[in-house]
UniProtKB/Swiss-Prot annotation:
Cofactor: [2Fe-2S] cluster
Entries under NCBIfam families matching the protein: PRK10713.1 (NF007985)
Molecular function GO labels: 2 iron, 2 sulfur cluster binding; metal ion binding
The protein's name in its UniProt record: Uncharacterized ferredoxin-like protein HI_1309
InterPro entries assigned: 2Fe-2S_ferredoxin-like_sf (IPR036010), 2Fe-2S_ferredoxin-type (IPR001041), 2Fe2S_fd_BS (IPR006058), Beta-grasp_dom_sf (IPR012675)
All residue ranges annotated as the 2Fe-2S ferredoxin-type domain in the record: 1-82
Keyword rRNA-binding: no
Amino acids binding [2Fe-2S] cluster: 35, 40, 43, 72
The entry's keywords: 2Fe-2S, Electron transport, Iron, Iron-sulfur, Metal-binding, Transport
Cofactor note: Binds 1 [2Fe-2S] cluster.
Amino acid sequence: MKIHLIRHNTTLEFNNETSLLDHLEKNNIHHEYQCRSGYCGSCRVKIKKGKVSYKEMPLAFIQPDEILLCCCHVESDIEIDL
């Protein structure tokens, strides 16, 4: 799958083997985080296109157009405001 980062103007390949947050860090793209488990909401970003899901609904409140990088499962190519 492809992850397009709007503000970085770059696209990364992604295979769901790690969290999206971990994958971004491995590619030297850093974003704020704290808990890494869906509790705090610090890693929240806007999703513009595509679909994600969660194994368990995160405790952090998110809007329908937001995802948590630490715990989302990418279902399709996505475009995020990052």
